Amino acid sequence: MLADDRLIVALDVPNAVAGLALAERLGDAVSFYKIGLGMLTGGGLALANELKQEHGKRIFLDMKLFDIGNTVEAAVRGLSQFDLDFLTVHGDPHVVRAAKEGAAGKDLKILAVTILTSLNRDDLDASLIKPGDVHDLVLERAARAFEAGADGVIASPQEAAAIRALPEAAGRLIVTPGIRPAGADLGDQKRVATPANAIADGVDHIVVGRPVVHAPDPRAAALSILAEMTSPQAVAPNRS
């Protein structure tokens, strides 16, 4: 079986032991995994290395780095020694540029976070983020990140089609969390879509956590999502 690496499963579990056990249950159904901050102190980097070197999996390290340029550059240079595939940083242009410098010479894609899919306009107001429609703010941040050299962006599926239409998005990646299979509980996500809709809107990779991780049969859940991704409703637009 050849896994479809457009599906990235978020290993939202407490530690590397649990992460490896889940990956073994998923087997060849999943070839791409996301490791986030929650597992960093639980052996996350060691797990990333084992999944990559021993099991041939692709690795997305979701760090959302945000600091002064020199610090971000140094952090990315250090992390790039782990043979990662994707790494997230905040979408501010100075952060993106510094991350690209740190990743120089490595086959590491720097993905810029636009606005978290768990946030809506009320949340942004509470955080004193400038006024404006969330959709427009995401597009503005995506365009600025691309101009700064980002290899891709993290954005909700609701903005994916509009981001794909940006001139700056040509040849860049769109990776979307906030994916829920039809009928699934939304959890803490507020700007969501189904796997089929996300792919149809031009998304390159979807990130799915709880619908797989918390399923009674994670492998069956992953296979069901993969089936949605290849359904007739999931035909991506021609990008030529």
Curated annotation (Swiss-Prot):
List the catalytic activities from the record: orotidine 5'-phosphate + H(+) = UMP + CO2
Q: Which residues bind substrate?
A: 12, 34, 62-71, 117, 180, 189, 209-210
InterPro entries attached to this UniProt entry: Aldolase_TIM, OMPdecase, OMPdecase_AS, OMPdecase_bac, OMPdeCOase_dom, RibuloseP-bd_barrel
The active site lies at: 64
Q: What CDD domains does this protein map onto?
A: OMP_decarboxylase_like (cd04725)
Q: Which GO terms describe its cellular component?
A: cytosol
Pathway as given in its UniProt record: Pyrimidine metabolism; UMP biosynthesis via de novo pathway; UMP from orotate: step 2/2
One GO biological process term: 'de novo' UMP biosynthetic process
Where in the chain are disulfide-linked cysteines found?
A: none
Question: Record's SUPFAM superfamilies?
Answer: Ribulose-phoshate binding barrel
Specify the domain of life of the species encoding this protein.
Bacteria
Tell me which EC number(s) this protein carries: 4.1.1.23
Q: Which family does it belong to?
A: Belongs to the OMP decarboxylase family. Type 1 subfamily.
Listed under subunit, the entry gives: Homodimer.
Q: What is the purpose of this protein?
A: Catalyzes the decarboxylation of orotidine 5'-monophosphate (OMP) to uridine 5'-monophosphate (UMP).
Q: What is this protein called?
A: Orotidine 5'-phosphate decarboxylase
Species name for this entry?
Answer: Ruegeria pomeroyi (strain ATCC 700808 / DSM 15171 / DSS-3)
